[in-house]
Amino acid sequence: MGCGAGGSCTPRPPIRQQPAPETRVVAVVFLGLLLDLLAFTLLLPLLPGLLESHGRAHDPLYGSWQRGVDWFAAAIGMPAEKRYNSVLFGGLIGSVFSLLQFLSAPLTGAVSDCLGRRPGMLLSLAGVATSYAAWAASKSFAAFLASRVIGGISKGNVSLCTAIVADLGSPSARSKGMAVIGVAFSLGFTLGPTLGAFLPSETVPWLALLFAISDLLFIWCFLPETLPPQKRAPSVSLGFRAAVDLLSPLALLRFSAVARGPDPPTGVRLGSLRGLGLVYFLYLFLFSGLEFTLSFLVHQRFQFSRVEQGKMFFFIGLTMATIQGAYARRIRPGREIAAVKRAILLLIPASLFVGWGHTLPILGLGLLLYSWAAAVVVPCLSSVVAGYGSPRQKGTVMGTLRSLGALARAVGPVVAASAYWLAGARVCYTVCAALFLLPFSILRTLSPAAQTLKAE
């Protein structure tokens, strides 16, 4: 595949002439995504200690950022303890990562719509490996921050995984593929934080780099091209112009890049697609806020250590993987929306149990319900959305959805952390519980067309 003047693409023979079996594609996506998520989640239990180590070393950049965080914490009335400010600091770093992912995912999707999924995936994974190499070699906070910036810009591979599954021909294969992606997330967020909590901190970045390089080589060897030349977008420049619509929150919620593209969904289906996108955004906005504050809640209320938090994440991830394997992947096409509505309703008592519970059994019950929702909502919504748009627009559709998710994750943690320390855990989690009624209510208003997986 080559691009001439003006960004037009000249199709070349695909790397693999015969279409690969759908089960093989799903298996390759699962293993590749699992390697990527293992590398990504190794950092989660290390971040507080990593920030503190840069503070103890009197790193100049860290010191200037810490003073800015101190000012912001004082401006919104947060307690003055350093650990609270560090929490906000860590949240800002996480939000920057998600913001960069939000900015880059549409461009990655547009490129893959023209050049194919395989080149886009390899390019993204090369950037991810570079970010872990920078982290492993870093001695200063500036180098660590640069590694997070590179990683955020390169994180379009997750969006491409959903686009690859969306390329599959049958609705049942797409539904199972999205469920398998959910299983990969569950296993990644189960094993990654556990490894990061128990391994020596100096070995973690090198292990992340090993996972990333292994992922790159695995995809290079085994991933077939799933978007044939005749179904690709005519030019990269058209894709980039459409990507501008993916950088505006309002345009994202309206799926403007899809509506203006070739063979867009029309009428009721376009309205349903927009409704599903709004549900996806609201859910991840609220869920990511709870997800971010959870580790600090159990540290303060139950005095969980880094190892105990690793065990908690292991419990959550194992529960998610069990639910996805035994239930979510067996949901029949056309029944996804009903499953999502039930899962969102479960988050209401889950939030109340976690926010108000002062015993481990109550916390465990809340985490069980929380894990059920986490196992069901995103895979099912992704599976439904994958049925919208023409074949050449699958990357744009799924890129839009992932951009909405990245935008939600960019603002959700900061908003939740601010509410947590302004009003306390009980108020924060109670408000979130009530707000989960919003996406549930929107789902109830969607037309029956939103519950089908028939391709346009």
Model-derived features with residue positions:
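A membrane-interface helix-boundary motif in multi-pass transporters
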Residues: F198-L210, A416-F440
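Helix-loop junctions at membrane interfaces in 12-TM secondary transporters
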Residues: E22, V26, A134-S147, F353-L367, ...
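Transmembrane alpha-helices of Major Facilitator/SLC transporters
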Residues: Q309-P333, A343, L347
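Helix-to-loop junctions at the C-terminal end of transmembrane segments
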Residues: L103-G116, T322-E336, Y420-W421
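Helix-breaking motifs and short loop linkers at transmembrane-helix boundaries and internal kinks
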Residues: G116, A137-A142, S154, S170, ...
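Cytoplasmic helix-loop-helix junction between adjacent transmembrane helices
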Residues: F141, L145-S186
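Conserved MFS/SLC helix-loop-helix module at the cytosolic interface between two early adjacent transmembrane helices
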Residues: Q101-F141
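C-terminal transmembrane helical hairpin of 12-TM major facilitator-type secondary transporters
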Residues: I337-L381
